[in-house]
Structures are given as C-alpha cells and as structure tokens.
Amino acid sequence: VKELETKIGIINPLENGGDCFEPVLRYGLKVCQLVSWDVSQATDVIADTVAAAAAKAGVRIAAFWAGVPGPQVWNFVEGPLTLGIVPEAFRAERVAALKRWADFAARIGTPAIITHCGFIPENMTDPEYAPVVDAIREVAQYCADRGLEFWLETGQETPVVLLRTIERVGTGNIGLNFDPANLIMYGKGNPIDALDTVGDYVRNIHVKDGMYPISGDSLGEEVRPGLGRVKFPELVRKLLDRGFTGDWIIEREIHGEQQEKDIRQTIADLNRWAAAEDSEP
C-alpha cells in the first residue's frame, strides 16, 4: 500500500505555458497525466518548460493524454462520426496531431501518449476496420521509433474489439489506459470481467466511476468513484492480484469545489481499498 501511495495521481491540464503542476501538489500527490486538446501547444519551448516545472515540483508525468483537433460529441449518435481516428473525415489530421504529441511526450520524458481511438467497428470484416487498424499502427510505430508506448483509452469499444485490434496492430508497444467507468457508461462491458480479456495490456488506470446507459442515445452518468457500478474494491483487488504496478489516475468530470472534495475522498478511498487487499489472508 505504501507503494500505491506513490502511484495515485490526477488528470492535469497543460496550462500556463507548461508551468502547471501546482494542482497536483495541492492534493499532496506526486503523479499526474498531463492533458491537452490544443496541438498548437506541442512546441519544444513548452515541452522544456513542462520538464523543468515537473522536475522542480517533484511530479512524475505518468503519460500524456493527447487530444486531437475537430469536433468531439460524447454520445452514441454523433460520437461514431466525430471521436478519435475512426471517422475518415478527420483521420489524417488526427494521426498527424498524435505524432506531434508523441514528439512532445518524448521531449518531456513521459513513457506514453494516450487517446480515444473512437468507435472501432465491432465487425472485423467491415471495410472500415482495416484502415482504422492501419492508422493506429502508424501512430504506434511512430511512438515506438521514439521509445514511447501508445495507450488506448477504453470506452467506445468492447474488450474483445480492443484485444483483436491490439493483436492486429502488432507493434508491441500498445497498451490500455483502462477506464472502468467508460466500459460501463458506454455499455461496452463489465470492467472486472474485461480484465480476463485485456488485462495483460493494462498500463494505467483512470479511477472513474459511472452508471450504465438508460437511454439508447446517451452515455450513462459519471459519478464519484465508489458510488457507481464499477465495484472498486473488487477491481483494485483483481488488478493487484494480476500484478498491476501502474498508476491510478483519478478522474472526476465535474468542476469547482465538489470536484476537489470528490478527488480528496477518492485518494482516501483508494488507499483504503488497497489496504483491504493487503489485509486479506
């Protein structure tokens, strides 16, 4: 559990020209995933500021969450047409953006970039499937050439789609940023069972919780970890039993005072859930 304390972090926006680690320290943490959706920030000057500021703050950047240009609609109606590198209309521009973020990530010294690939087709004989695999492979190979991994954030795909896609990409540096809430909120799987299918590829966890969809067009609701359907004590136990040693990045998709309260509560809960794991015979 002492080890877990050094692996709990938050999502931290890339702001202030790269000098942006005060929020991490405010929670008493030493780890974050840095995130930006503005690829114009992917400059050497900002990267060097990030590296210096992180070193000064004593914060480790677990990975860089790489947002991409163009529209993003987080539902089941427009989502397949707008999210990730699945939509052909945005694919080339987004692959290029991910490569720029990979250069940025290599310069700041973080091990991986993360993104949502989108609603990858369930049917592997769909003519749209192979080009998506090729695009993921292009980004993954670019990352590999720079000593980076490419982590796909779970959510818009079933676990078996993720598995077969990783197998087909075949670059050896693909992992998962495992967001258990997204599997539930998108209605794509039970996260605890999903580890049977993709557990070997889990590199980072988003500590997020949510409910299953109750409308055919909209995602389920996101809630504070412990209040949704993830069953965190069981998930933490299964991950640790499988030998997971990565980071636990808390994500609470609200803003203001309640977000801060919820994050502080989740830090305490994570330590408690992990301690319960330690005390078992």
Predicted regions and their residues:
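Hydrophobic faces of well-ordered beta-strands that scaffold small-molecule active sites
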Residues: 6-12, 32-34, 61-66, 113-115, ...
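C-terminal helical cap(s) of enzyme catalytic domains, especially alpha/beta-barrels
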Residues: 259-278
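Catalytic domains of carbohydrate-active enzymes, especially glycoside hydrolases
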Residues: 14-38
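Glycine-rich, proline-tolerant flexible connector loops at the mouths of alpha/beta enzymes
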Residues: 33-54, 117-124
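Acidic/histidine-rich catalytic cores of soluble enzymes
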Residues: 31-32, 64, 133-229
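Acidic (Asp/Glu)-rich catalytic clusters
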Residues: 21-27, 44-65, 100-109, 141-145, ...
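Active-site beta-loop-alpha junctions enriched in small/polar residues
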Residues: 11-15, 35-37, 66-69, 118-120, ...
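Active-site acidic/histidine proton-transfer and metal-coordination neighborhood
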Residues: 18-22, 73-175, 280
